[in-house]
């Protein structure tokens, strides 16, 4: 089952933590998250799954930044979230999709117990000017059945910003 907006509001501070939180971003069954001003772009192609891939930082000015097709931009939400006893999921807003912007490639699924900023895997299918602070995605919550084991991986937990892929750590096992 997906939580309603009223149920999300009721669980804020308990099962759900969103920082900063504004009731204005609450929807009937989700909560809008905003785009932070920083982006990362990989600087060496091809990317290699077995090693860390270098990236450079871009800052989205108030006047906007032109995103181009064929480039993966890593961004993050302005809000950090923490979820217990629920499964958080992230999707792009339909208004953003109608402009040809995707906010994630495959990472729209969060684990129970995840806390931190959501790294966004941004791409555009046509040139698009983006702005910092725009509500680009929405988080919604599923209930669980069965015994709950919270996410404890050190790879992405309690992040402090945008994270490039750490898949290379899987090869070190």
From Swiss-Prot:
Keywords: Hydrolase, Nucleotide metabolism, Nucleotide-binding. It is an enzyme of class 3 (hydrolase). Coiled coil: none annotated. DCTP binds at residues 93-98, 111, 119-121, 138. One of its GO terms (biological process) is nucleobase-containing small molecule interconversion. Pathway: Pyrimidine metabolism; dUMP biosynthesis; dUMP from dCTP: step 1/1. Its EC number is 3.5.4.30. The keyword Cell membrane does not apply. It holds the Pfam family DCD. The active site is at residue 121. One of its GO terms (molecular function) is nucleotide binding. It catalyses: dCTP + 2 H2O = dUMP + NH4(+) + diphosphate. CDD domains: trimeric_dUTPase. The keyword Cell wall biogenesis/degradation does not apply. The record marks 108-109 as: Important for bifunctional activity. It comes from the Bacteria. Belongs to the dCTP deaminase family. Homotrimer. HAMAP family: dCTP_deaminase. PANTHER family: DCTP DEAMINASE. Bifunctional enzyme that catalyzes both the deamination of dCTP to dUTP and the hydrolysis of dUTP to dUMP without releasing the toxic dUTP intermediate. This is dCTP deaminase, dUMP-forming. It comes from Leptospira interrogans serogroup Icterohaemorrhagiae serovar Lai (strain 56601). The lineage of its organism: Bacteria, Pseudomonadati, Spirochaetota, Spirochaetia, Leptospirales.
